[in-house]
């Protein structure tokens, strides 16, 4: 088994980028950008399995805005809704709240036998 590691000391387009990797895979997460997984790379093939929007660079969104105007690619958390909706008098944005909010994070285990990154966010609208 190859060594695993977490490197929290990267920045990409002025966003913190936390890189998790082992001998086979590399993932890049933006905690400030809804814990977006921006890269998921098979290292042997140098193949990123996540699409990047050629027209939009990663940037901090404004809460409640249209997801499509901010989507730079990658893999986003879209809890708790898929469309704009109202529940118990509260209006939820398109594709939810979590994609546009900064998440707290900590490295639980930095490697080399195991690497574990813990990310957490409380919603603003949803109970």
Positions of the model-derived regions?
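Surface-exposed acidic/polar loop and edge beta-strand patches at domain peripheries
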Residues: 1-127
């Amino acid at each position: 088994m190859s060594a695993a590691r977490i490197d929290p000391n990267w920045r990409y387009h002025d966003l913190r980028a936390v890189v998790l990797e082992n001998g086979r895979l590399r993932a890049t997460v933006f905690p400030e950008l809804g814990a977006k997984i921006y890269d998921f790379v098979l290292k042997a093939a140098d193949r990123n399995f996540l699409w990047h929007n050629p027209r939009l660079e990663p940037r901090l969104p404004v809460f409640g805005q249209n997801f499509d105007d901010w989507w730079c690619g990658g893999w986003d958390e879209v809890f708790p809704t898929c469309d704009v909706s109202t529940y118990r008098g509260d209006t939820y944005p398109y594709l939810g709240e979590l994609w546009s909010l900064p998440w707290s994070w900590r490295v639980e285990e930095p490697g080399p036998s195991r690497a574990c990154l813990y990310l957490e966010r409380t919603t603003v609208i949803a109970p």
